[in-house]
Curated annotation (Swiss-Prot):
Taxonomic placement: Bacteria, Bacillati, Bacillota, Bacilli, Bacillales
Native species: Staphylococcus aureus
Gene3D superfamilies: 3.30.230.10
Family matches, as NCBIfam families: rnpA
Keyword RNA-binding: yes
UniProt-listed InterPro entries: Ribosomal_Su5_D2-typ_SF (IPR020568), Ribsml_uS5_D2-typ_fold_subgr (IPR014721), RNase_P (IPR000100), RNase_P_CS (IPR020539)
Official protein name in the record: Ribonuclease P protein component
One CC-aspect GO term: ribonuclease P complex
Length: 117
């Protein structure tokens, strides 16, 4: 199941605005940019996985794992624009490892509205 269109960031102008005005947090596997957006009452997600990470199958696997993590925590995420950039070490991780690493960096970025186990 996909995230609905309202939850996606697709336009380059939106990505550039978040890169410039947003706050970034990183760990070895991911960089997360967050930016407040008062126009909406839910989060929006943009995902960037470079071609340097591998072929399309691998890049799509990483993107699916990231989207799945956001779907699981959908009700606990604050209304912000969020961009997740996958780094090189993410290509060697399992889906569970991606989930744990992403949750770790999202907690640091303070995008959850309450404690997540």
């Amino acid at each position: 199941m996909l995230l609905e269109k309202a939850y996606r960031i697709k336009k380059n102008a939106d990505f550039q605005r978040i890169y410039k005005k947003g706050h970034s947090v990183a760990n070895r596997q991911f960089v997360v940019y967050t930016c407040n957006n008062k126009e909406i009452d839910h989060f929006r997600l943009g995902i960037s996985v470079s071609k340097k990470l591998g072929n399309a199958v691998l890049r799509n696997k990483i993107k699916r794992a990231i989207r799945e993590n956001f779907k699981v925590h959908k009700s606990h995420i604050l209304a912000k624009d969020i961009i997740v950039i996958a780094r090189q070490p993410a290509k060697d991780m399992t889906t569970l490892q991606i989930q744990n690493s992403l949750e770790h960096v999202l907690k640091i970025a303070k995008v959850f509205n309450k404690k997540i186990k």
